[in-house]
Amino acid sequence: MPDPKLQSYIAAHYLSGPKADAILARASSSDIKVKRKKKKVKTDDASRVSSSSGLVFKDDSDTWKTPAEDDEDDGGLTPQVVDGADGQSLNKTFRKIGSASHGAKEAGTSDTASMSTPTPAPTSVEEPTEFKAGLRTRDEMKAARLAREERKKREAASLSVDVSMASSTPAANDDDDQEARLAQQTVYRDSSGRIIDLNAQQAEQERLERLRLEKQAERNTWSQGLVQKQQRQQAAAQLAAVQQQGIARRATDNEYNEYFKQQQRVDDPAMAFLTKKRSAGPSMPKYKGGWPPNRFNIPPGYRWDGVDRGNGYEKAFFERKAQLETRELQARAWGQSDM
C-alpha cells in the first residue's frame, strides 16, 4: 500500500487536475480522523494466582485482546531494531511476576554478568581517503588534504632515495650502458661495404643547404642597383651608431646640425650663392656636354668626340616610345573633347 503522505506531497507539487484534487481531499479527510486510544490489557485471574508462585502463564489466544496499531500512525511501516540489547524485545512481550527480592537477585546477577562479559574493543578509525564521492564535511575535507600532502611527501622521499641510489652507482655501469647502446645501433653500409655515418651525412647536407641559401640571397641582390645597396649599408651603419647615442636631441647637437647642413635641395633659394661642396679625395674627369639618351642613362667617357657609333637601336627605341605616348595622349584628348 503506497504511503498517503507521499501521494499527497506528489499531488501538491507535481500533479494537477481532478486526480490531484481527489488525492488531496482524501489526504485531508484522513488527517481529520481521530486516532483510537490503545486499551490496556487487564490481567486475568490466572496471572493474579500465579503472582504468588513467581510463574508466568501466557496463552496464545489472549493476543486478540491487544489492540493492533493504527495504520495511520506509521503508514504501514514496521519499526526495525538495529542495535538493541538481547533481552529488550523479550521484556516488552513478557512481564515477570514475583517478589521484590527475586527481582533484586536477578538484577544483581545481571550486573555481575555484564561485568564478567568483556567490553568489545572500539572499532579502528578508518584512514581518511584522499578521494571520496558525494558531499563531504569540513573534517573529511581536512583529512583528505592531509592524506594528499602525506602521499606527496612519501613520493618525494622515494624519488630522492632513487636519485641517491642512481648517483652512487659506479662509473663502470655507465660504460656498460654506453657499450650496450652502441651495440644496439644500426650500422648502414653502401654497395662497397663501407660504413655510412648518418650524423656526418646529415651535417654535410645542412652545410650544403646553408651555402645554397646564401647564394640565393646573393643572387636576389644582383638585379638591384648599387645606389640602393649603398643606401642600405649606410642605414645599417647609422643604426649601429644610433644605438650608442642618447635619446635627447638639443639645439647644440653638432652632429645633428651638420647632417641637415649637408642636405641639398633643388628649390633652395640659397643654392645660387652657396659654395659647392667638394668631395673628399681624387675624382675622375667627366664628359662636359650633352649626349643622346640611352636606356640606362649611362654618360659617355670624358674623351668622347660626340660621334654616335651605335647601330641606332637606342634612337629607334626612344622614338617608338615617344610615338606611343603621343598617340595615347591624343586618344584621351579626343575621348574627352565632348565632355
Swiss-Prot record:
Keywords: Coiled coil, Cytoplasm, mRNA processing, mRNA splicing, Nucleus, Spliceosome. The keyword Cytoplasm applies. Residues 197-222 form a coiled coil. Residues 34-195 are annotated as: Disordered. It comes from the Eukaryota. Its main location: cytoplasm. InterPro entries: Bud13, CWC26_splicing_factor. Residues 136-156 have a biased composition (Basic and acidic residues). Residues 109-124 have a biased composition (Low complexity). One of its GO terms (biological process) is mRNA splicing, via spliceosome. Pfam families: Bud13 (PF09736). It is found in: Cytoplasm; Nucleus. One of its GO terms (cellular component) is U2-type spliceosomal complex. Involved in pre-mRNA splicing. Belongs to the CWC26 family. Associated with the spliceosome. This is Pre-mRNA-splicing factor CWC26. It comes from Mycosarcoma maydis.
